[in-house]
Amino acid sequence: MENTERQDSRLKTIWNRMMNLKGDKVILIIIILLILISFLAIFSSTPLLPSQSSRLATMKEHGFIVFLGIAVMFVLYHFEVKWIRGLSKWGFIASLGLLSLLVKEIDWGFIKTEEINGAIRNFKLMGLQIHVFEVVKVSMVLYLSWAVSAVNEDMQARKERRRSRTLTIANWLADRYTFLSFLRLTKWKRIVYVYLPSIIVCMMMLKGSGSSAIFVGFILVATMFICGVPWKELAVAGMIGIAGFAALFAVYKVSDGKKMERIGTVLSRMGVDYDMNRLEGLEGYEFHNMLDTLRQPVSAKVAIYEGRLLGKHTGNSTQKYQVSNIYGDYMYSFLVEEYGLLGGIIILIIYLSVLARSVIISRMSDDEFARYAVGGLALLITGQAFMHIAVNVDLGPMTGQTLPLISHGASAFLVFCAAFGVILSISRKAKNKIQSAEEMTQASKNNIEENLAAAEKIED
């Protein structure tokens, strides 16, 4: 009895401390829900991990990853917005460096690239797998938030005829070299700082994953849109991007698929017919190759069908034995199979709540970079969740996008914890300012009431 009371007391203490955090409580509750769902789902969906590890070992590993993720989130939560802004401007350089190492396929002993499913997307750093594309997504969203806000700040400074404190390199080059004087124009600064980095990153990602490059490109364009980039410039940049992809496609065709192989992978996935009747008449290697191609997406659809309204309940999934990585790319199908359509709808509501709440946080903030960062990160989290769901319900080709904070995967989990940490930090700052404004308003109101009361006494 005493032990139970102590445990209840500890839980209440932990809950009270969490509720005393100054960040947005709704986002905090969403994070807790997603982490709890991930524990439940990963424990139940991992009977056949590639390493053949036990469920207990898997849960220990996931528990350690969750601990690291919460630590990352906690550290970023205490960051000032100006610190996050200062780090964000290096997002493109960091992404460029990581992707360059992938393209060169380095092998330096302690760190080397790793090929998975015919594509190079990861590093092995002293045995730890690092998914570069996950890092690039968040880095580039934060970078674009900085770049657009910096361009706007520079433009405002020039209008007010004062020295700009942002984009110092572009301004210095424009002042020093006559042939680079075009860099004084806001349009060219957007080209150099916003459009070119986005196009370069997406092009470099094509070698590792064409579908990921397209998805990241879409997220970056959407981030630019919510940042207020002129739609005409976005249209031109989009046309340039399409022209670049067309040029790469031409290289793929001219080389008979020997170069830019990932383009062929994207096209093949978009054109795959997941009908099991395609196995008829096939034998040997062709039969097994086609079976492997069809098994996962077909089993994912079967899982959704068998889930029906209320699902099979925890631990009763059967399709997890058919889909080897259901804990990653097909986590939503697994959740629907075990918890039914209602469970699937709850997952949708949770991710939509992230977007809705982030809109409120963005409006609360008076810092331009903070508004863009919250909007872009929320768009990334929700967009990836819905891309994952679309693939699971057969509304799109396989992309390898995981379900944020639920699917198994260390790199993705830590990166999205960092994204949520930034959102919480910005919400904390915005809430502090609102609270200060409310206190000032209340103080002014009290002062007015005191003055009125004093005036009435004098009249009496």
Spans of model-derived segments:
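Membrane-helix boundary/helix-loop-helix interface segments in multi-pass membrane proteins
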Residues: 2-27, 40-41, 45-207, 389-403, ...
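Alpha-helical transmembrane segments of multi-pass membrane proteins
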Residues: 34, 99-102, 146, 205, ...
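Alpha-helical transmembrane segments of polytopic integral membrane proteins
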Residues: 36-42, 141, 145, 352-355, ...
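Hydrophobic alpha-helical segments of polytopic membrane proteins
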Residues: 69, 89-96, 172, 189-206, ...
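Hydrophobic, glycine- and aromatic-enriched re-entrant/interface helices and adjoining loop segments
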Residues: 114-122, 235-344, 368-369
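Interfacial segments of multi-pass membrane proteins
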Residues: 214, 220-233, 318-343, 401-414
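Loop-to-helix entry and N-terminal half of a specific, functionally important transmembrane alpha helix
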Residues: 360-400, 406
